[in-house]
Amino acid sequence: MENKSIPQATSPLAAWLSYLENLHSKTIDMGLERVSQVAARLDVLKPAPFVFTVAGTNGKGTTCRTLESVLMAAGYKVGVYCSPHLVRYTERVRVQNSELPESAHTASFAEIEAARGEISLTYFEYGTLSALWLFKQAQLDVVILEVGLGGRLDATNMVDADVAVVTSIALDHIDWLGPDRESIGREKAGIFRANKPAVVGEPDMPHTIADVANEKSARLLRRGVDWQYEVQENVWRFSDAQGALDNLPLPQVPQPNAATALAALRASGLAVSEQAIRDGIQQAILPGRFLIVSESPRLILDVAHNPHAAAYLAGRLKSLPKTGRVLAVIGMLHDKDIGGTLACMESVVDSWYCAPLEGPRGATAEQLMEHLGKGAIYSSVAQAWHAAMADAKPEDTVLVCGSFHTVAHVMEVMDAGRTGGE
């Protein structure tokens, strides 16, 4: 008899996601043994002839997007797995920079459900297996995997990377990864492989990353030592052991991440022309990362949710021509460094619009206000955003930040407004 509690291949995606959220006893359960067993049964441990794996506290998404953009410009068929999503689950898997239909995801979930037997999987492990299965079906040239949490014990690390990338190291997820940059660096370097390039974009690299590279006999390529970049006026220059690339176009993604992606591409040995590099760098853009949505007032969406990302965001804001005020809509998760994140932003924000985030991890607006001397409390992200937009004059900037969830809420409200107006 059919088990009504387990969705089928033809079930709606929402039914599957609800099922996956309640499948495992723990939301996060670090370790590769269970998920690797199921991956072996599905034969997805080699999802493509060439694999990049990208870890790091911040900058993973834009580094992956730059890799994808340049490789596609060079003629490769590329798949990207990233998380979390902003609005739709299907954002997590891209093939040739396009999302797949929900039916493809539900078909993959049904395959995993059949293969896992009695093995319990977390939501993220299920999603990772699904991405690998979808990539295998698509017969790709290159797959780019964004690590979910850490590196060493993350589900993506069941796949052997041909090039491993660590974008940056800062304090985040300390409950899982350790209390300092050295312990976090060791976890992230767990994606390194013997005799394979290990590209590090963090300029202040923890010693543990070099230790792991030595232990694993990985080929460490460090920013500022083995490769470097320099921004000049309206162009930039990249150099490594292979030589220099001059007069590169400035990227739309953060400069360090574009440079890290370029270092990884050049270390890969894949054939990529200089023209593909130039075209790919110019075309790479990722929603929610210093995304300027509109002007008058200027609306900027950024998922910055820790001090490292907030400091970068503050710097970007300072680099813009100063016109009016900066009104910030903020919602955060309570397990983040709220005080440290807001402190990095206080010098550039004139007025705060504090909103709670739903769910057990969401911080209340009152918790945010404890760290701020100025601002107002609202009952939802949507209400805070509407209030900020109503208060903003044409010369002002409205910034939405603090979490993927905060940005996603505003994007959904904006989409609903556009749809409602049709």
Regions found by a protein language model. Give the residues of each.
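Charged, amphipathic alpha-helical linker segments immediately N-terminal to NTP-binding catalytic cores
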Residues: M1-T27
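ATP-dependent carboxylate-amine ligase catalytic core
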Residues: P12, K26-I28, L32-P49, A73-V159, ...
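Beta-strand->loop->alpha-helix junctions that form or flank phosphate-binding loops
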Residues: Y81-P84, V200-E202, N214-V231, L248-Q252, ...
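A conserved segment at the C-terminal end of the G1
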Residues: F50-V54, T62-G79
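Nucleotide phosphate-binding/pyrophosphate-handling subdomain across enzymes
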Residues: A48-F50, Q137, V142-V147, D154-V165, ...
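Extended acidic/charged loop-beta regions that coordinate divalent cations
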Residues: P84, R88, G127-W176, H207-L245
